[in-house]
């Protein structure tokens, strides 16, 4: 179940025509997997954005939408009390959703939507286990429009004058940081979980050539420091009183020099709005 609020450009306006009726907003959703004792019934808070892919008729369009946010209320893995949960290891997980649907404008106030979507819950390897939870499903709902006028239902057929796009170069700079757990290979060829978390940080710097209102492309300089890169283990006896069932007892995890944990490279970028 979802409850959302969104906003968009005025129907028939120049930005609305250029960007295909794009809209964005914030939403809240509730999930039940039929196993509250092991997985919980999480609640997600998220941002969403969507737009028209194609117009089928004056009142019917084929749209896409994606969501991104956080979900809480999970029952994470516990070696003693919830050992059957091999999917999630944290109480808070990232929420990602993408889907396509038909939008039918019924009246000035109401739209009917029907389609399908894919959802992924994960903590991004910040805790183990992190198999995640994936779902696919059908969606059906009603959209209430607060400020839409009767005339707005036909404005989508009007194409206002769009001036020629001034091509130019822009620059994107992204800084990021996080942490992660690591599975390390041992002599038997199996992986065991390291006992701690490792920092991750990096940047992307990309000059982008803006070709038109919707498309830009360029080359990005990417740098990353991954504290878990090339971590290895030796079969040595160390003082672990209890390993929590992780299999780390009796092993020392070794971190190589920083020169083995840095990476720098180039990548191609393309963005279609």
Each PLM stretch: what is its role?
Residues 1, 12-18, 38-39, 56-96, ...:
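Outer-membrane beta-barrel translocator/channel fold
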Residues 1, 20, 39-45, 90-96, ...:
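Residues that define the transmembrane beta-barrel architecture of outer-membrane proteins
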Residues 1, 28-30, 64-72, 114-120, ...:
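Transmembrane beta-barrel strands of outer-membrane/channel proteins
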Residues 3-7, 47-53, 66-70, 96-104, ...:
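Residues on the lipid-exposed face of transmembrane beta-strands in outer-membrane beta-barrel proteins
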Residues 12-15, 104-112, 148-152, 213-217, ...:
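Repeated loop/turn-to-beta-strand initiation elements of outer-membrane beta-barrel proteins
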Residues 18-24, 58-64, 108-112, 134-138, ...:
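Outer-envelope beta-barrel architecture signal
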Residues 33-36, 82-88, 123-130, 188-193, ...:
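Extracellular loop and loop/strand-boundary signature of outer-membrane beta-barrel proteins
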Residues 134-155:
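Outer-membrane beta-barrel "beta-signal"
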């Amino acid at each position: 179940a979802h409850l959302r609020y969104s906003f968009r450009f005025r129907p028939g306006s120049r930005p609305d025509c250029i960007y295909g009726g794009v809209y964005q907003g914030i939403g809240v959703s509730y999930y039940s997997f039929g196993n509250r004792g092991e997985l919980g019934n999480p609640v997600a808070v998220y941002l969403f954005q969507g737009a028209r892919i194609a117009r089928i008729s004056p009142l019917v369009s084929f749209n896409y939408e994606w969501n991104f946010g956080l979900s809480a209320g999970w029952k994470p893995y516990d070696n003693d009390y919830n050992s059957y949960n091999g999917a999630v290891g944290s109480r808070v997980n990232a929420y990602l959703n993408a889907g396509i649907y038909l939008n039918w404008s019924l009246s000035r106030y109401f739209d009917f939507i029907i389609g399908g979507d894919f959802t992924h819950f994960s903590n991004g390897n910040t805790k183990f286990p992190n198999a995640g939870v994936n779902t696919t499903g059908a969606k059906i709902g009603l959209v209430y429009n607060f400020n839409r006028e009767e005339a707005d239902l036909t404005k989508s057929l009007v194409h206002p004058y769009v001036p020629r796009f001034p091509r130019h170069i822009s620059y994107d700079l992204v800084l990021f940081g996080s942490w992660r757990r690591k599975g390390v290979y041992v002599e038997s060829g199996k992986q065991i979980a390291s006992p701690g978390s490792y920092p991750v940080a990096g940047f992307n710097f990309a000059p982008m050539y803006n070709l038109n209102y919707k498309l830009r492309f360029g080359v990005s300089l990417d740098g990353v420091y991954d504290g878990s890169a090339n971590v290895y283990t030796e079969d040595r006896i160390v003082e672990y009183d209890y390993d929590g069932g992780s299999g780390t007892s009796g092993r020392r995890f070794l971190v190589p020099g920083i020169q083995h944990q840095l990476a720098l490279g180039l990548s191609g970028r393309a963005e279609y709005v």
